[in-house]
Amino acid sequence: MKKIVFTGGGTVGHVTLNLLLMPKFIEDGWEVHYIGDKRGIEHQEILKSGLDVTFHSIATGKLRRYFSWQNMLDVFKVGWGIVQSLFIMLRLRPQTLFSKGGFVSVPPVIAARVSGVPVFIHESDLSMGLANKIAYKFATKMYSTFEQASSLSKVEHVGAVTKVSDQKNPEPDELVDIQTHFNHKLPTVLFVGGSAGARVFNQLVTDHKKELTERYNIINLTGDSSLNELSQNLFRVDYVTDLYQPLMELADIVVTRGGANTIFELLAIAKLHVIVPLGREASRGDQIENAAYFVKKGYAEDLQESDLTLDSLEEKLSHLLSHKEDYQAKMKASKELKSLADFYQLLKKDLS
């Protein structure tokens, strides 16, 4: 039986594509393994998926771009993770390794290369993360969502592979219940801040609940169960799975962080959106770059977190609603998306 090893983690964005691809390989008779951190979100997501995947936990160290005494300790953690990954590779003898990035992916990528296993990696953002910059040196090929510099000879630009589609599905009963609390004469705004929510969005909704619910139906994916609430013109919930796409479809506008997975999902369904990217003080600036790219393409509006107020947000919402047809036309004309089926076929061809 053919074997494939997946790796990637730290955030949902480093796991999502793997979760989409693994069932395809299982259906085709592959034995699927995953290398990650048992304390990480990658392990949680695989357990929730119920997929027939063997999980191997390794030591991990965070890759920091700044000086910290913890870097010294993490060098040893990464080194031990490489040794653990090498033993896994030598024991399994897989046909390939597919990495979605995140610091946990570096040891398996290095170990795969050392043991002669072809390495395929995927980069979602406009600029490579530190983990993928390291992984690229050991990779057979990198697939990218955005076009990369021509000097990167091992990169193939494939566009975004998303988990949502423009196909309409029957409304879940829970969605029908939510809609009974909404005023259908008001626009619906969805706040989504990634796998852990976004405190800045949560605070905005909390501080201005009265004003917001007078003018909009508000959906707030919080990442915090203590904020759960269903009341007139307001639905706050910590986490959703099956409701994710239905809520996106229900919304007239989405207010989101600038993670590539989410914004390309919005592009796939031509949904109006305002991007509030993580700042450079909290990230490497990749979300700022992603947001600027989407604004330049005419897909979205952006708003820096430092400028986020009720007034500034409402100005963006009003602009999007007033120019809805223009934004949606540009999104529908986009050639930057790839279906999961097409990407899977491309990957299988490269593996053969």
Curated annotation (Swiss-Prot):
Family annotation (Pfam families): Glyco_tran_28_C, Glyco_transf_28
Q: Is the Membrane keyword given for this protein?
A: yes
Task: State its location(s).
Answer: Cell membrane
* Domain of life of the organism encoding this protein: Bacteria
Q: What is its EC number?
A: 2.4.1.227
- MF (Gene Ontology): glycosyltransferase activity; undecaprenyldiphospho-muramoylpentapeptide beta-N-acetylglucosaminyltransferase activity
Q: How does it sit in the membrane?
A: Peripheral membrane protein
GO terms (BP aspect): carbohydrate metabolic process; cell division; cell wall organization; lipid glycosylation; peptidoglycan biosynthetic process; regulation of cell shape
State which pathway it belongs to.
Cell wall biogenesis; peptidoglycan biosynthesis
Which UniProt keywords are present, listed alphabetically?
Cell cycle, Cell division, Cell membrane, Cell shape, Cell wall biogenesis/degradation, Glycosyltransferase, Membrane, Peptidoglycan synthesis, Transferase
Q: Which residues bind UDP-N-acetyl-alpha-D-glucosamine?
A: 195, 287
The entry's cellular-component GO terms read:
plasma membrane
Its catalytic activity? Mur2Ac(oyl-L-Ala-gamma-D-Glu-L-Lys-D-Ala-D-Ala)-di-trans,octa-cis-undecaprenyl diphosphate + UDP-N-acetyl-alpha-D-glucosamine = beta-D-GlcNAc-(1->4)-Mur2Ac(oyl-L-Ala-gamma-D-Glu-L-Lys-D-Ala-D-Ala)-di-trans,octa-cis-undecaprenyl diphosphate + UDP + H(+)
User: Transmembrane ranges?
Assistant: none
Enzyme class, broadest EC rank: transferase
SUPFAM superfamilies on file: UDP-Glycosyltransferase/glycogen phosphorylase (SSF53756)
Family under the similarity heading: Belongs to the glycosyltransferase 28 family. MurG subfamily.
Instruction: Briefly state the protein's biological role.
Output: Cell wall formation. Catalyzes the transfer of a GlcNAc subunit on undecaprenyl-pyrophosphoryl-MurNAc-pentapeptide (lipid intermediate I) to form undecaprenyl-pyrophosphoryl-MurNAc-(pentapeptide)GlcNAc (lipid intermediate II).
Protein name (Swiss-Prot/TrEMBL): UDP-N-acetylglucosamine--N-acetylmuramyl-(pentapeptide) pyrophosphoryl-undecaprenol N-acetylglucosamine transferase
What does the organism's lineage look like at the top? Bacteria, Bacillati, Bacillota, Bacilli, Lactobacillales
List the gene name.
Answer: murG
